[in-house]
Amino acid sequence: MSLLIKNGTIVNDDAIFKSDVLVLDGRIVEIAPSIQPTPGLEVVDATDRLVIPGGIDPHTHMQLPFMGEIAKDDFHRGTEAAVAGGTTMIIDFVIPTKGESLLVAYDRWRGWADPKVVCDYGLSMAITSWGPEIAKEMEIVTGAEYGINSFKFFLAYAGVFMVRDEEFYQGMIQCAKLRALARVHAENGSVIAERCEHLLSSGITGPEGHTQSRPEELEAEATFRACTMASQANCPLYVVHVMSKGAAAAIAHHRKKGAVVFGEPIAAGLATDGSHYYNEDWLHAARYVMSPPLSRDPSTPSALMKLLAAGELHLTATDNCTFDCQQKSLGKDDFTKIPNGVNGVEDRMSVVWDKGVHAGIIDPMRFVAVTSTMAAKIFNCYPQKGRIAVGSDADIVIWNANATRTISKDTHHHAIDFNIFEGMQVHGVPEITISRGRTVWANGQLKTVQGSGQFIPLAPDSQIVFSAVDNRKKAMEPVKIDRIPYEPSALQTPDANANIVVKAPVRAAIPPGGASSIQF
């Protein structure tokens, strides 16, 4: 595929400049102020448009089996929605059932994804059980044959995915040994289970019970706990779906102490809030059920965006895990049975541009960083991904910063019958999406080929993640004090009170602090 992009303004995470871009065989081969077209080249006119790296969504759950259902967006529909929104790579999660081999689960996910994806993808691995065999398989899947460089631990979903603190800690020690990133879903699953039982017994069965069972304090507590444990294990930590100010504050606290912690807010948390859970329409409220829940504080979305601007949160994702209205209705009499998950992979880029750049909170370079480049660096596929540069994959979006669109279930490409951003007008529109040199979205139309995406192996030991770990390890080495051997004499049994000097009481003429003026 030969392609020439003319007259555009390139935006990377560290620079903005006008230039043309030449693409051959799926890679960028030249960037220059004026490249002359040759016969056979497809020419794209990007006048008054931005030329940006394709988005990377580092947190999706396509066709995930969960809560007795299967997420509606499979790897075909989900990646079609992604490219329609300007995202050219996703990182999905292999989630084994309790006790299942990581290798067996990995093969199942690859079998689902490879024939369906229309853009590139990578995989992260969830750890839902612990033991010597799991630790051994973690080492295997971080090899080049499997291409896994991160492991996710759930501190929620008791009895399903949740691991105990000691398992989480041991897992992070193994991650650090393998130079793999630990990722965490931070909620207090034990307390949540108790609260759910209490609320249901109190007659609260609707979606409002979901948010009441998972107050923000439980996300903040679990985030702080996870960061503390990761620091003790000397393991870099990535906190997925940061939904509250308290969780973000916990991350900032530990980073200020030198911990290597990354925070990921998601599109839903940047654009909506938890007021929806109290809507009188049960189905409307149920559509927004996800975990952790959306914040009930209406100022949280703006606060999270400002933390992205300040560098206290680091990249954006979606946790795209879609269930339609019929599936959501399975919990009509019990909020704990509402399948958790929302959409986002199609709308993330526009939502972040609208709430960030258009709102004057971040600049276009920071937009590229939090939607693409930072993910590429953290997951060790930079500069292959996440940059407009010679030698990089031609994952490119022609972005119209001045255009607007209204988000709607009637026009989106998800496999569900609602959209949590319904009716929201957003500034910033991907006009053309290019995946490894192939135009997959143009003029509002998909041009995809099922199975044309590639699996991207992700190698461990990302330098942005692990460059400080070795020095931290040296600083954390245990300190031993060399002492003269202590050998108490067995022949001496001194009286415990023998050396105690007892003084006779003496009345102070003027006690310390001065004499009292109180008269009795």
Swiss-Prot record:
Cofactor annotation remark: Binds 2 Zn(2+) ions per subunit.
Membrane-spanning intervals of the chain: none
InterPro entries reported for this sequence: Amidohydro-rel, Hydantoinase/dihydroPyrase, Metal-dep_hydrolase_composite, Metal_Hydrolase, Metallo-dep_Hydrolases_sf
Gene: dhp-2
Top-level taxon in the UniProt lineage: Eukaryota
Self-association and partners: Homotetramer.
Family statement: Belongs to the metallo-dependent hydrolases superfamily. Hydantoinase/dihydropyrimidinase family.
Listed SUPFAM superfamilies: Composite domain of metallo-dependent hydrolases (SSF51338), Metallo-dependent hydrolases (SSF51556)
Description of post-translational modifications: Carboxylation allows a single lysine to coordinate two zinc ions.
Reactions the enzyme catalyzes: 5,6-dihydrouracil + H2O = 3-(carbamoylamino)propanoate + H(+)
Residues modified to N6-carboxylysine: 152
Keywords for the protein's UniProt record, in alphabetical order: Hydrolase, Metal-binding, Zinc
Protein name as catalogued: Dihydropyrimidinase 2
Coiled coil: none
Binding site for Zn(2+) 1: 59, 61, 152, 319
